[in-house]
Amino acid sequence: MAVQQNKKSPSKRGMHRSHDFLTNPPLAVEPTSGEIHLRHHVSPNGYYRGRKVLPAKGE
């Protein structure tokens, strides 16, 4: 079993965890309808990059 040789200081522990945070996903605004959606995804009303590619829910 692996056992540490020396205790890691709070500074080193913080440096080790410095990349563990979460970031918000980048959002895009659809130019035709103004709706907000995830980048590279179809907006809820069925538009992608200004073109209608899917029928919207309820159409």
From Swiss-Prot:
* Region feature (Disordered): 1-59
Q: Is Ribonucleoprotein a UniProt keyword of this protein?
A: yes
Named from the GO MF annotations, one term is: structural constituent of ribosome
Arranged from A to Z, the UniProt key words for this protein are: Ribonucleoprotein, Ribosomal protein
Which ranges form a coiled coil?
Answer: none
Give the Basic residues compositional bias ranges. 49-59
Q: Which NCBIfam families does its entry note? A: rpmF_bact
The name this protein carries in UniProt is Large ribosomal subunit protein bL32
Native organism: Methylobacillus flagellatus (strain ATCC 51484 / DSM 6875 / VKM B-1610 / KT)
Question: Which gene produces this protein?
Answer: rpmF
